[in-house]
């Protein structure tokens, strides 16, 4: 049979020595995908992430497997047959079953190499298990006929043949039983000890095996990707419509403002609608189906919310709720979060070398005060005390921030204190807009990981903003908003007249100003930065997702890496 090959995996012999040959009936329990047994034999953690937590990542091997599938269909190799067995507890799609001298031959196509053998090529244990499961389904569907398994390895142009014997039957039954047990558990299996498997696994960026091993002080190769090649699509012109045409998103501006543009869906990671932008139902459905987040902002830059497929299994959120109901867990995470935020502010102020003696004195005083707050964070007895420390740090930081601006900056763009809702000066108008983009970035990462934004560990519920989003966002205010904004103002990148709409009560970004702020933010996100703890470089966009995944590891794996990165 030729099943869609989603990635190359070797396999271990976990289920190949089982002796049971007669499965117990499965009543009222969902059956197991036959293809999932391949993942189970390769790595139990991989099976759990894909089948229980519903996390799947399409990498180059996935697309290569799909191309093989399409090629075989075009060549007439596929005759698809849907099979399911309540007795076996399995279901799957058989692509090719052929008759050879009275024997039903089940074919399995793999794009990679066969396993090394003695005198003849051998099938990998995970491939044997998968083919055996399909053979059992075929045997039940066509009783009486003998069944044989064949696995075709296209890279080496070899076919491995083996019978559906008692050992293989028992291995399939044992694997199904193990799969049911894992599916009923709330706990992820541990990271595999066979490290070579992680390098070839598409879910390594989700599993983070090398980061988990690093907690115990081991040196490991970097598996988390440096950047996401896809782009965020911002639509900010009022009256613009976003639709779908085949595999593309079509952006149609208002009449008289240009021709429609097309964006290949595979190259879009998120669609962001600013203000009065219409998104069709077809485009929304396409985005959800293809894991493209859709997010809405007001025209003034306030983040309203988002829609995304993400990972939908309840086990991940149950673990989150159980962990964050513990006051000690919340306090420990909050201590590290506030310390990381204060140290980020401190390090930004330390970068300043400009200014007269007064500026240097103000900056030095703020740095001393921020340093004095750091050890207090580690000893804070409650969240309320931490809030006070954070507030004291913010007062010293924002009091010193004007001294990071150059002397030749337009006075209308000078920072004279934090204000918002609505912003009353140009600097705060841009800063608030950037904070909204950071908030969106963080909430999108939280949804992608499968956590609940409404259940945090530090901030209390208020308004429509999810506490967990506000928690994680604290790590990124300085690097993704404060630093690029101050630098752009010092470069005189802003037009105090054309980029803003000023009234007696508030200041908003104009259309040109919004476009400039979006470009500033997206450019900053693409910049790479070397993580001081993990020791590898990645973009700021990937850093946001990494921090959320490291947060989840605080209660699902090896804790200790969340909120440990620091600015240089």
UniProtKB/Swiss-Prot annotation:
Pfam family, one: Cas_Cas1
Entry binding sites for Mn(2+) 2: 390, 459, 474
Function of the protein: CRISPR (clustered regularly interspaced short palindromic repeat), is an adaptive immune system that provides protection against mobile genetic elements (viruses, transposable elements and conjugative plasmids). CRISPR clusters contain spacers, sequences complementary to antecedent mobile elements, and target invading nucleic acids. CRISPR clusters are transcribed and processed into CRISPR RNA (crRNA). The Cas4 region acts as a ssDNA exonuclease, while the Cas1 region acts as a dsDNA endonuclease. Involved in the integration of spacer DNA into the CRISPR cassette.
One Gene Ontology MF term: DNA binding
Enzyme Commission identifier(s): 3.1.-.-, 3.1.12.1
GO BP terms in the entry: defense response to virus; maintenance of CRISPR repeat elements
Enzyme class: hydrolase
Induction section of the entry: Part of an operon going from at least MXAN_7266 to MXAN_7259 that includes a CRISPR operon with transcription continuing into the pre-crRNA locus.
Signal peptide: none
UniProt KW Mitochondrion keyword: no
Protein name, entry field: CRISPR-associated exonuclease Cas4/endonuclease Cas1 fusion
Catalytic activity: exonucleolytic cleavage in the 5'- to 3'-direction to yield nucleoside 3'-phosphates
């Amino acid at each position: 049979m030729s099943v869609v090959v989603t990635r190359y995996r070797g396999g271990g012999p976990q289920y190949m020595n089982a002796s049971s040959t007669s499965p117990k009936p499965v009543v009222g329990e969902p059956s197991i995908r036959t293809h999932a047994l391949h993942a189970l034999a390769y790595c139990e953690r991989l099976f759990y992430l894909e089948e229980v937590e519903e996390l799947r990542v399409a990498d180059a091997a996935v697309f290569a497997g799909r191309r093989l599938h399409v090629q075989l269909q075009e060549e007439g190799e596929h005759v698809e047959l849907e099979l399911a067995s309540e007795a076996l507890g399995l279901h799957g799609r058989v692509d090719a079953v052929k008759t050879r001298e009275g024997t039903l031959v089940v074919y399995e196509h793999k794009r990679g190499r066969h396993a090394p053998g003695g005198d003849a090529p051998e099938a990998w244990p995970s491939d044997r298990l998968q083919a055996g499961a399909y053979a059992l389904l075929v045997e039940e569907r066509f009783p009486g006929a003998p069944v044989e398994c064949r696995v075709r390895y296209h890279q080496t142009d070899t076919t491995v043949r083996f019978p559906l014997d008692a050992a293989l039957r028992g291995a399939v039954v044992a694997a199904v039983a193990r799969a049911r047990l894992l599916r009923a558990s709330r706990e992820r299996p541990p990271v595999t000890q066979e490290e070579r498997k992680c390098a070839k696994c598409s879910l390594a960026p989700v599993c983070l095996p090398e980061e988990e091993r690093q907690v115990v002080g081991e040196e490991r190769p970097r598996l988390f990707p440096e950047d996401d090649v896809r782009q965020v699509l911002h639509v900010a012109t009022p009256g613009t419509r976003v639709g779908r045409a085949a595999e593309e998103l079509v952006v149609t501006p208002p009449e008289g403002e240009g021709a429609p543009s097309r964006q290949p869906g595979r190259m879009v990671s998120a669609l962001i609608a600013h203000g009065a932008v219409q998104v069709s139902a077809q485009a929304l459905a396409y985005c959800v189906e293809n894991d493209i987040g859709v997010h809405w902002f007001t025209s003034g830059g306030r983040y309203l919310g988002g829609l995304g497929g993400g990972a939908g299994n309840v086990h991940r959120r149950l673990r989150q709720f159980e962990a964050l109901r513990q006051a000690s867990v919340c306090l420990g995470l909050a201590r590290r979060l506030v310390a990381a935020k204060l140290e980020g502010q401190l390090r930004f102020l330390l970068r300043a070398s400009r200014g007269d003696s007064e500026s240097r004195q103000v900056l030095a005083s703020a740095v001393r005060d921020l340093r004095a707050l750091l050890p207090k964070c580690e000893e804070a007895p409650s969240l309320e005390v931490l809030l006070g420390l954070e507030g004291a740090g913010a007062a010293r930081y924002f009091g010193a921030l004007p001294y990071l601006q150059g002397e030749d900056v337009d006075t209308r763009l000078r920072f004279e204190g934090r204000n918002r809702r609505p912003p009353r000066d140009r600097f705060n108008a841009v800063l608030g807009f950037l904070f909204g983009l950071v908030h969106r970035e963080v909430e999108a990462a939280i949804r992608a990981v499968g956590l609940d934004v409404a259940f945090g560990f530090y901030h209390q519920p208020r308004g429509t903003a999810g506490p967990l989003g506000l928690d994680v966002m604290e790590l990124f205010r300085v690097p993704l908003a404060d630093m690029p904004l101050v630098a752009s103002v010092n470069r005189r990148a802003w037009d105090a007249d054309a980029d803003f709409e000023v009234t007696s009560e508030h200041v908003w970004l104009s259309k040109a100003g919004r476009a400039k702020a979006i470009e500033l933010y997206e450019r900053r996100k693409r910049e790479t930065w070397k993580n001081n703890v993990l020791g590898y470089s990645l973009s700021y966009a990937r850093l946001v997702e990494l921090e959320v995944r490291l947060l989840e590891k605080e209660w699902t794996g090896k804790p200790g890496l969340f909120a440990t990165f620091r600015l240089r």
